[in-house]
Curated annotation (Swiss-Prot):
It is found in: Secreted. Glycans are attached at N36. The lineage of its organism: Eukaryota, Fungi, Dikarya, Ascomycota, Pezizomycotina. This is Biotrophy-associated secreted protein 4. Residues 1-21 form the signal peptide. Secreted effector involved in biotrophic colonization of plant cells. Participates in transition from the biotrophic to the necrotrophic phase of Magnaporthe oryzae. Elicits rice basic defense responses during the early stage of interaction and promotes cell death in the late stage of compatible interaction. Keywords: Glycoprotein, Secreted, Signal. Induction: Expression is highly up-regulated in invasive hyphae. One of its GO terms (cellular component) is extracellular region.
Length: 102
């Protein structure tokens, strides 16, 4: 039984990593705190969304509902967005990105 649980855990880990690289319709930048809680980072989300649009990575990206980077064409690449949150907008405190809850 333990082997089955381990196999499932490994498969889930790969599925999560794979989903990061997928194209998305909505993403947000997040900041993770030392207690492992995280919160959406609106300033970094705006910066990352603007950076991707300005640099031709997501032509239809806009800020939606005043909190999400949104692409009708689902052209938000998870890896590119996270890179924009953390490295292209480094002074805004984002530590990663996330698919927002529905």
């Amino acid at each position: 039984m333990q082997l089955s649980f381990s196999a499932i855990a490994i498969l889930l880990a790969f599925a999560v990593n794979h989903a990061t690289a997928d194209s998305h319709q909505n993403l947000v930048c997040v900041r993770t705190y030392p207690d492992n809680n995280s919160a959406e980072n609106l300033e970094a989300t705006r910066c990352a969304c603007d950076w991707l649009k300005k640099n031709g990575k997501c032509d239809d990206c806009t800020i939606w509902e005043n909190r999400l980077c949104h692409s009708d064409a689902k052209s938000l690449d998870g890896n590119e967005f996270e890179d924009a949150c953390v490295r292209k907008c480094p002074n805004l405190g984002a530590t990663g990105s996330s698919i927002p809850p529905a």
